Each structure stands twice: as C-alpha cells, then as structure tokens.
C-alpha cells in the first residue's frame, strides 16, 4: 500500500448547476435541516474548512497565469482521507498534518465523513448533492481486506485491483460517465506505465436560488480585470437582504439556495474603481 501512496493519481470533479430540469422531487420546498455535530465532529469540520482555504491558496499559486480555474477542496480531502486509512509511519504523520487531523483517530475521521456524506443530501429539497469515490489499483499491489472494507463502509468507495490496460481505461471512463450523469464521459485515454493507482472523487451539486435572478434584469456592466483592463460583461442583478462582510482586504456576500441551509459565498478584493453595491 505504501508504494501505491507514492504513485497515486488523484482526480476530482466538482459539477455545479443552478437550473431546474430534473424530475422527481427536486425543487420541492422542504424545512431547513441543520446537521447536528458532536464536539469532535465540529472540530474536524473546522479543520476541513481550514484545509479548503489552504488548498486553494496553494493551487492559486500554480494557476495564477490562467484566466480561470475551478477546484474542489472537499474532493481532495475525501481522496486523501481514503489514503489515510492505508498510511502509516512518516507518511501518515505528514498527511495528518496537511489535513489538520492531528489529534483525531481514523475512526473519528471516518465517522465524520460517513455522517457528512449521509446528511448533506438531506439538507434542502431545492438542491441535489451527490458524492462518489473510487480507488483503482494496478494488479500486483494487493490491498488489505481491512483497507477495502473501511473505505467501502465510510466513504462508500468502489475499490478494486485492475490490469491497468485498455479494459481499465474503459471501466474508469464508464464510472466517470455514470457518476457525472454523462457530463464527463471520458477522463483518461491511456494509463502511464508507472501509474499504480487512481483515486477519483466526483461531486455533483445542483441548486435553485432562494431568491432567483430574473433574466430580464441582466444588463451589460463594466468589469475591471486584475491586469487593469476593462471589459463589458452580462451581469445578473437583484435587490435582496443577504449576509455581507467587508474589510480592507476582502468583500464577501452570501447567496442562499432553497431553504437557506446551503449558500454560495462570493468574495472579491475591493478596489477604488468598483465595489459590490449594497443597499
């Protein structure tokens, strides 16, 4: 398992949608439901949030020349959490430190993950949240039954040894196609000779705004680029009372979905040219 850890290739998907084209009960109003957290679970949750911002900052350093990028820190923490169940020694210590999980047992971490994966989809009938995990390992690197059972039980992960030939490429792509509702039909076209394992997480979120934007209110507005340039872009607008925070370094506004249990927080660095218009 240690060799696998050193050669793991990690894929994460975060698919977002704010439209209503699903059947079933999606879009049905439901009372707000908040996840009850024990003291330990609350502490772990705080560390997951800390890791999310740390992870974003590190990725932003390497992607700073790109116009846009999208990451899912939750996906990364789930994949690393699965690996943590098979790590020991210095590898385990360093992973715990990176994730902020020092002082917590694997059992406490696993129970937190299991609870969140079970409870998050229940929060709001006007949102859909699905999460899928899988671990694919090359034949010749047998996995301990306890490791497989743990990740199946707490992460609901599909774990298997594979020949890592074209048939494995097809299996992985088929899994991705299924778990992303056909939005990502293919993620790899070959497997490198030195690849030993693939850890894949797919998170899908679909939500309806609590206060929906009217298409008729969208207007072209001036947008100031970080480079100093100016462009005109279609800009959604509405007048609502929402949670808002600002200081010298950042402005943050929270836009709730459905019953308010989930929300999207937008942040922006304030400039002398343009600030979020708050009334």
Where are the regions that the model predicts?
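Detector for small/aliphatic-rich hydrophobic stretches
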Residues: 3-7, 16-164
């Amino acid at each position: 398992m240690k060799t696998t850890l050193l050669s793991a290739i990690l894929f994460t998907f975060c698919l977002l949608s704010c439209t209503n084209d699903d059947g079933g009960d999606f879009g049905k109003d439901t009372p707000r439901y908040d996840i009850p957290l024990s003291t330990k679970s609350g502490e772990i949750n705080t560390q997951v949030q800390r890791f999310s911002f740390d992870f974003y900052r590190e990725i932003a350093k390497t992607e700073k020349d790109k116009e846009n990028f999208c990451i899912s820190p939750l996906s990364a923490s789930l994949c690393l959490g699965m690996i943590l169940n098979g790590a020991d020694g210095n590898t385990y210590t360093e992973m715990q430190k990176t994730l902020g999980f020092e002082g917590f047992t694997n059992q406490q971490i696993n129970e937190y993950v299991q609870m969140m994966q079970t409870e998050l989809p229940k929060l709001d009938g006007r949102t859909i949240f699905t999460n899928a995990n899988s671990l694919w390992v090359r034949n010749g690197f047998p996995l301990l039954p306890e490791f497989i059972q743990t990740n199946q039980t707490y992460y609901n992960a599909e774990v298997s040894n594979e020949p890592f030939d074209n048939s494995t490429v097809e299996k992985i792509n088929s899994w991705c196609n299924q778990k992303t509702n056909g939005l990502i039909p293919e993620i790899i076209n070959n497997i490198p000779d030195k690849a030993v394992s693939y850890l894949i997480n797919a998170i899908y979120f679909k939500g309806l705004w609590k206060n929906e934007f009217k298409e008729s209110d969208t207007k072209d507005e001036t947008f100031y680029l970080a480079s100093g340039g100016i462009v005109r872009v279609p800009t959604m607008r509405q007048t609502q009372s929402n949670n808002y925070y600002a200081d010298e370094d950042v402005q943050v506004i929270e836009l709730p979905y459905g019953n308010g249990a989930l929300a999207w927080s937008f942040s922006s660095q304030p400039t002398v040219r343009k600030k979020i218009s708050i009334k």
